Amino acid sequence: MESLKIYNTLAREKQTFVPIEPGRVRMYVCGMTVYDYCHVGHARVMVVFDMVQRWLRASGYDVTYVRNITDIDDKIIKRAVENGETIGALTNRFIAAMHEDADALGVQRPDREPRATEYVPQMLSMIGRLQDNGLAYQAADGDVNYAVRKFPGYGKLSGKSLEDLRAGERVAANDAKQDPLDFVLWKSAKADEPAESRWASPWGEGRPGWHIECSAMSCDLLGTHFDLHGGGADLQFPHHENEIAQSEGASGSTFVNTWMHNGFVRVNDEKMSKSLGNFFTIRDVLKVYDPEVVRFFILRSHYRSDLNYSDVHLDDARHALTRLYTALKDVPAEAQARPDWNEPHGKRFREAMHDDFNTPVAMAVLFELATEVNKTRSPALASQLAALGGVMGLLVRDPHAFLQGGVGAAADGLDAAEVEARIEARRAAKAARDFARADGIRADLLAAGIVLEDKPGGVTEWRRA
């Protein structure tokens, strides 16, 4: 069997994936900071690494998947104060919203979903070890900082020297730091900050810095050396670089073997940002597009490439997914079928996924298989199509339910009951040999985005275009 190859950001090349413990994969992904609704960029992280963990499990690995929740930081405190609510009320509300969004997108829950506020003792312990190892110091302002110049490997993930990083990054001047690149491990409490945002520590009251949260949680749940760490490309520096410095500085050993980063999301070929007014929450998108269409759209691009969000691309994804479901509509597929990896399409699908999770090529195999199903009407091939799609979290619904579903209603507000009523009126018109009226009803439905298919025996099926 071919080996799984993954592009390792740390090595800057595709490498054969060899887990530390044979047959077992320990995997950590940086999750959401819960002070607002999740946006399309978050959707990509959720779906991409859901695809990764699904494929690892389908390949026979015992996977422990951890994705954290950041439920304390400056933005959270600021938003809670602005809203006049507690930090806990704010974060619990947006954690629930995040779960709703993830569930809609077919994202399986991680095995562990630690909240930063639950791991403060572990963070304090790690900061203490860093200080003991000469890698951390308490500054005049009360903050505890990491001394980057004391860690020889700093910059290895981004591939830059300290000099390059200082020149290329916008680092705020801070007289309390020994080096502009030094980053905070423990933030001293400010007088005007709420009591629930501070914890006691050997360095005085305060709260953890963002970077130490992920190091402490991942090492506590997966061990100080684990297989796979993922996140968006925007986290490569400084967040992931700082995680390496913290974790390896505390343990003295390798932190993570393989680093994965998904590409950026762009909107109509521009960077997505609130300032440009092209910022979309997952909820905004799901008001217009079926969640499975959004998942399909995300997986249609390779995870390392930038993803260009536009209505044109989402409409195209909807039509493409409709083609796959249409192939399954009238051919009985075995429920809960497992992929046949010895069948030619199964072999090519696995080859694609084993090549750095090449979902665009894997999807091309699905369309080839759909063409064969349309030609042969083979239940075995239909089962294979549904099974391979299922590995990616796609094609898991009843085909008729997908084809007749849709978000909201059709263009003129028709729901399923109204469509059926018009089909019945068309049937009555045909029985009365009023073919002009029957054709008019069909044309009106088509204009409303409803496609009719007349079947033998006087049966009419329909789907949304």
Swiss-Prot record:
A motif ('KMSKS' region) lies at residues 271-275. Its cofactor is Zn(2+). Disulfide bonds: none annotated. Pfam families: DALR_2, tRNA-synt_1e. It comes from Ralstonia nicotianae (strain ATCC BAA-1114 / GMI1000). It is an enzyme of class 6 (ligase). SUPFAM superfamilies: Anticodon-binding domain of a subclass of class I aminoacyl-tRNA synthetases, Nucleotidylyl transferase. Its EC number is 6.1.1.16. ATP binds at residue 274. Monomer. It is found in: Cytoplasm. GO terms for molecular function: ATP binding; cysteine-tRNA ligase activity; zinc ion binding. The keyword Protein biosynthesis applies. Keywords: Aminoacyl-tRNA synthetase, ATP-binding, Cytoplasm, Ligase, Metal-binding, Nucleotide-binding, Protein biosynthesis, Zinc. It comes from the Bacteria. This is Cysteine--tRNA ligase. The gene is cysS. Gene3D superfamilies: Cysteine-tRNA ligase, C-terminal anti-codon recognition domain (1.20.120.1910), HUPs (3.40.50.620). The keyword Aminoacyl-tRNA synthetase applies. Transmembrane segments: none annotated. It catalyses: tRNA(Cys) + L-cysteine + ATP = L-cysteinyl-tRNA(Cys) + AMP + diphosphate.
